[in-house]
C-alpha cells in the first residue's frame, strides 16, 4: 500500500512539477530550516542547474568532471576542497549545500552563477579551459568572502551544519515563547 502511494505521488509530481517543490519545502520545514533559508536553497538549486546546463553545452561529462569542476569552484571561494569542507562540517554523505549557512549558500551561488556567466563569455572548448573558468568564478566569490570577513571580523565558513542550525532555530523559538509567558 505504502509503495503504491509513493509511486502515485511521483507520477503526480511528473505531471505537476510544482508538487515536487512543495514536497521539498515541507521536508526542509520539518528539518527545522527557516523559510528564508529554504528560499535561498531553492534558488541555489536553480543556479546549479544553470551551471550544469552550461557545462553540458560545453561537453563536460557528468560525474567525475562535474565533481572536479565543482571542487575548483569550492576551493577558489572557500579555500578548501569539497571533501575538506564536508569534513569541517562533520558530514559523510549528506549534501554540503543543505548544511551551509545562508551566507555560505549565497557565496556558493555567486561562485556558480559567476562561473556560468564567464563560461558563456569565454566559450571554453576543453576540460582544461572549463577548469580555468571554474576557478575564475570561484575566485570572485572568494574575494567577496574575504571582504565580508574583513568587515565583520569573523569567518563566513563555520563548522555548523543543519543540526546546529535546527538547534539554533529551536532555541530562538523557545526563548521567544519563554519571553511571551
Model-derived features: where do they sit?
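Positively charged, phosphate-engaging catalytic surfaces used for nucleic-acid and nucleotide handling
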Residues: 1-181
Amino acid at each position: 500500500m505504502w509503495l503504491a502511494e509513493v509511486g502515485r505521488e511521483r507520477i503526480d509530481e511528473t505531471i505537476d512539477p510544482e508538487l515536487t517543490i512543495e514536497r521539498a519545502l515541507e521536508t526542509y520545514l520539518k528539518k527545522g530550516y527557516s523559510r528564508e533559508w529554504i528560499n535561498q536553497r531553492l534558488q541555489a538549486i536553480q543556479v546549479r542547474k544553470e551551471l550544469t546546463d552550461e557545462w553540458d553545452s560545453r561537453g563536460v561529462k557528468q560525474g567525475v568532471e562535474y565533481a572536479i569542476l565543482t571542487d575548483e569552484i569550492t576551493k577558489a571561494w572557500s579555500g578548501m576542497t569539497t571533501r575538506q569542507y564536508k569534513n569541517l562540517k562533520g558530514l559523510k554523505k549528506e549534501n554540503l549545500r543543505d548544511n551551509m549557512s545562508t551566507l555560505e549558500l549565497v557565496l556558493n551561488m555567486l561562485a556558480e552563477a559567476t562561473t556560468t556567466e564567464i563560461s558563456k563569455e569565454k566559450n571554453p572548448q576543453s576540460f582544461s579551459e572549463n577548469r580555468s573558468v571554474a576557478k575564475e568564478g570561484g575566485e570572485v566569490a572568494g574575494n567577496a568572502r574575504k571582504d565580508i570577513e574583513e568587515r565583520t571580523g569573523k569567518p563566513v565558513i563555520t563548522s555548523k551544519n543543519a543540526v546546529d542550525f535546527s538547534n539554533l532555530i529551536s532555541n530562538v523559538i523557545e526563548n521567544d515563547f519563554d519571553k511571551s509567558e
